[in-house]
Amino acid sequence: MEELSMANTMFALNLLKQIEQSNSTQNIFISPWSISSTLAIVFLGAQANTEEQMAKVLNFDKIGSYDLTPGNPENFHGCDFAQHIQRDNYPVAILQAQARDKIHSAFSSLSSTINTPRLGDYLLESANKLFGEKSARFKEEYIQRCKKYYSTEPEAVDFLECANEARKKINSWVKTQTKGEIPNLLPEGSVDEDTKMVLVNTIYFKGRWKTPFQKRLNGLYPFRVNLNESKPVQMMYLREKLNIGYIKDLKTQILELPYIGNISMFLLLPDEIEDSSTGLEMLEREINFDNFNKWISKETLDEDDVLVYIPKFKLAQNYELKPILQRMGMEDAFNKGKADFSGMSESNDLFLSEVFHQATVDVNEEGTVAAGGTGAVMTGRTGHGGPQFVADHPFLFFIMNNITRTILFVGRFSSP
């Protein structure tokens, strides 16, 4: 499970970089955990080069014995050498099956930990499903493995003859699964008679802060979008003992805001806007697996009495991930002539048409949906001897499960 968390973190940061490149100044909110766990359902039926590309993009090739490239005996010693020799005697098919099983078993365990919080801690509403053209006919073995590892099964729809009705059916299913939060995920024209397979992934997060923000200090305050523009936004205020740190090389503060239930939001805020866009260019360029783990560790963070001001906001972002995943290296899965999903269907023309993703979050005083209300313009920024965290310009944020160290959500707030 630890290896899978590492793989998911790598995927999350790589995905963020790709989305940042195509949306240099816009708000971003995605659930890389939800995306990777849904793509794993497709990976379950992928074969040959399609499987290899997906494994690299999702970083599944970093898990256990998935990389089946023969090793050099000089690199093995003692028990490792004996295990390697013994492993070389196994048929490749058995090794591959064991490696795949380890990935999907880890997802099952990780999903159980993340998706079943203690009563009242937080809420994750998600809808994840693979919809395929009914003529493809999914293999019974694939259906059973989907049920075993992911508690779901693919659904056959009639894209060929009734594409728009299939779209409405998918939207209706998503609306029901998310209790009305996401009523129209697939827009008109998003599927047609050539559509073979669509992956739907939506997630909605509601959490409660461990220490709620002060409502009485809500009010309008200028949020600097860039060097030349500001927009009014409601700000929230909190004074509390929190983990806070400073990344000197990037002139960036990092703050941990805990939710109830082993979930935290980590915010990364540059001191000032020092580029021509959001002020986040250098920070976004330097984010990688090693740096991120260092930034959120005790090596960087210390508890202090912190004065916090952050905007009150709600983000509901829609993405069609096909071009992004293709740029990351997952090409064959979307290619009619190259895709190999023979593990899920006997049909040789099955390919992934699109991956639709929507993630929604509310950030407010309670940490969940709160009643409206206005108050005084933000005050009280002086007379405090401890550190201040004033998010009145663009910042990045990560919502993480602290037990599994899994990044559930990644966001960039650049404009109200």
Swiss-Prot record:
Q: Which molecular function GO terms apply here? A: serine-type endopeptidase inhibitor activity
* Taxonomy, superkingdom: Eukaryota
Glycosylation site residues: 23, 228, 262, 402
Give the GO cellular component terms, alphabetically.
Answer: cornified envelope; cytoplasm; extracellular space
Where it sits in the cell: the answer is: Cytoplasm; Secreted, Extracellular space
Sites marked Reactive bond: 381-382
Question: Post-translational modification, briefly?
Answer: The signal sequence is not cleaved.
Keywords associated with the record: Cytoplasm, Glycoprotein, Plasminogen activation, Protease inhibitor, Secreted, Serine protease inhibitor, Signal
Q: Name one GO biological process term.
A: negative regulation of apoptotic process
InterPro entries in the cross-refs: PAI-2 (IPR015556), Serpin_CS (IPR023795), Serpin_dom (IPR023796), Serpin_fam (IPR000215), Serpin_sf (IPR036186), Serpin_sf_1 (IPR042178), Serpin_sf_2 (IPR042185)
* Pfam families named in the record: Serpin
Q: How does it assemble?
A: Interacts with PSMB1.
- What is the purpose of this protein? Inhibits urokinase-type plasminogen activator.
Q: What is this protein called?
A: Plasminogen activator inhibitor 2 type A
